[in-house]
Amino acid sequence: MAPQTETKAGTGFKAGVKDYRLTYYTPDYQVKDTDILAAFRMTPQPGVPVEEAGAAVAAESSTGTWTTVWTDGLTSLDRYKGRCYDIEPVPGEDNQYIAYIAYPLDLFEEGSVTNLFTSIVGNVFGFKALRALRLEDLRIPPAYTKTFQGPPHGIQVERDKLNKYGRGLLGCTIKPKLGLSAKNYGRAVYECLRGGLDFTKDDENVTSQPFMRWRDRFLFCAEAIYKSQAETGEVKGHYLNSTAGTCESMMDRAQFAKDLGVPIVMHDYLTGGLTANTSLAIYCRNNGLLLHIHRAMHAVIDRQRNHGIHFRVLAKALRLSGGDHLHSGTVVGKLEGEREITLGFVDLMRDDYIEKDRSRGIYFTQDWASLPGTMPVASGGIHVWHMPALVDIFGDDACLQFGGGTLGHPWGNACGAAANRVALEACTQARNEGRDLAREGGDVIRAACKWSPELAAACEVWKEIKFEFDTVDKL
């Protein structure tokens, strides 16, 4: 094998001593049903051939290294290597390409999202031949999917446990997120739940701080849940954040929540770790707890268009690892989300079979082989005027979380919750009657205001509040 030692002028980049194309670029390869497929957006360094860059990604994320080693002869590299089988330019972008790579199933440990990510994205992102690299999508074959439990319960079982059908679920993140005592925190939870919400939520960074230790919070929130259930006759819940500094502490918190008889706990799956999340999901399945997942830290990984990991991949990873809810963006609120792309990964979270559709960012057809679905959670800067769009975009199988849009009501938390509940039911009824919420949503809300003073007050407060900025992909 001829070494490459040429230094590219003006870049200081040395292509290395091994030509990956000879082994790992295989455009004639026929993809197998059992292969794990990856679509990488890559930006090669100046002077690096695109085929070499694609082959390098395949090599460094599977069996390759920078030189030939004698132990290559002790195994069958042709059986275990990743293969770059196709490369296409990204329309409208200079020097950006989508590299399609197939990985044999035997490269991965069964039931381990941690091992899957360690192999595919663990090392290759620092490769010198690439200026930038982004994992856009993965195809998980049924043969691998079947090695995972997935979400503890899934959407249908959650509805059965809650006895709530025919509409989206309503939630609220308690604010201020930090600083309240446990008793005052529980009071805020109670007011929201008795006003008409289905759930309230710990914020992602509420764990066990000096002003509110986790055990005290769990106790006061459980009291709020039971009191509001007795008043309303509905099943209520609060996402008790079980994320902790150690896996042992995390499991202790989940165990305490189970002992209290509450229906749901919460985990920050990226900061807490995928291994910890899978363990918690298995515990929740075995003990009848729903599991709400927050995606804290996701934007560090997924926000840049040319480097990192797209959220659709993180969403697929979570569905494998296990979670009944996952924050997914809103399209209409303060947090970023483009409509068609967001709907693409929302479908990947909750549907069983999703066809390839590049207009929605779906690079591969995904068959989840009856793995339970994960309910998307829309939150971040939304209020009652957004309700028609949210019902139109997400449909019924979603949890709509109004934090400031509940607690910011001028008459208090319970009235804010009532306003959101009235708006949701009015929009759901209008949709069921065949009305076009995208065009008539404002009229639906205004009509509902006539018989809900709480909604009328909310509409007056938030009538001018908008979050209109371009997404990062357009900047």
From Swiss-Prot:
Residues of the propeptide: 1-2
Top-rank taxon: Eukaryota
SUPFAM superfamilies xrefs: RuBisCo, C-terminal domain (SSF51649), RuBisCO, large subunit, small (N-terminal) domain (SSF54966)
Substrates-to-products reaction catalysed: 2 (2R)-3-phosphoglycerate + 2 H(+) = D-ribulose 1,5-bisphosphate + CO2 + H2O; D-ribulose 1,5-bisphosphate + O2 = 2-phosphoglycolate + (2R)-3-phosphoglycerate + 2 H(+)
Record-linked CDD domains: RuBisCO_large_I
Residues where N6-carboxylysine is found: 201
InterPro entries named among the record's database cross-references: RuBisCO, RuBisCo_large_chain_AS, RuBisCO_lsu_C, RuBisCO_lsu_C_sf, RuBisCO_lsu_fd_N, RuBisCO_lsu_N_sf, RuBisCO_lsuI
Sites where the protein binds substrate: 123, 173, 177, 295, 327, 379
Residues recorded as bearing N6,N6,N6-trimethyllysine in the entry: 14
N-acetylproline modifications at: 3
Co-factor(s): Mg(2+)
Cofactor binding note: Binds 1 Mg(2+) ion per subunit.
Localisation per UniProt entry: Plastid, Chloroplast
Binding residues for Mg(2+): 201, 203-204
Post-translational modification note: The disulfide bond which can form in the large chain dimeric partners within the hexadecamer appears to be associated with oxidative stress and protein turnover.
Residues forming the catalytic site: 175 (proton acceptor), 294 (proton acceptor)
Molecular function per GO: magnesium ion binding; monooxygenase activity; ribulose-bisphosphate carboxylase activity
Enzyme class: lyase
Record keywords, A-Z: Acetylation, Calvin cycle, Carbon dioxide fixation, Chloroplast, Disulfide bond, Lyase, Magnesium, Metal-binding, Methylation, Monooxygenase, Oxidoreductase, Photorespiration, Photosynthesis, Plastid
Subunit structure: Heterohexadecamer of 8 large chains and 8 small chains; disulfide-linked. The disulfide link is formed within the large subunit homodimers.
Function according to Swiss-Prot or TrEMBL: RuBisCO catalyzes two reactions: the carboxylation of D-ribulose 1,5-bisphosphate, the primary event in carbon dioxide fixation, as well as the oxidative fragmentation of the pentose substrate in the photorespiration process. Both reactions occur simultaneously and in competition at the same active site.
Cited HAMAP family: RuBisCO_L_type1
Miscellaneous note of the record: The basic functional RuBisCO is composed of a large chain homodimer in a 'head-to-tail' conformation. In form I RuBisCO this homodimer is arranged in a barrel-like tetramer with the small subunits forming a tetrameric 'cap' on each end of the 'barrel'.
Family: Belongs to the RuBisCO large chain family. Type I subfamily.
NCBIfam families: PRK04208.1
Name of this protein: Ribulose bisphosphate carboxylase large chain
Organism expressing this protein natively: Tupiella akineta (Green alga)
Taxonomic lineage from the root: Eukaryota, Viridiplantae, Chlorophyta, Ulvophyceae, OUU clade
Encoding gene, per UniProt annotation: rbcL
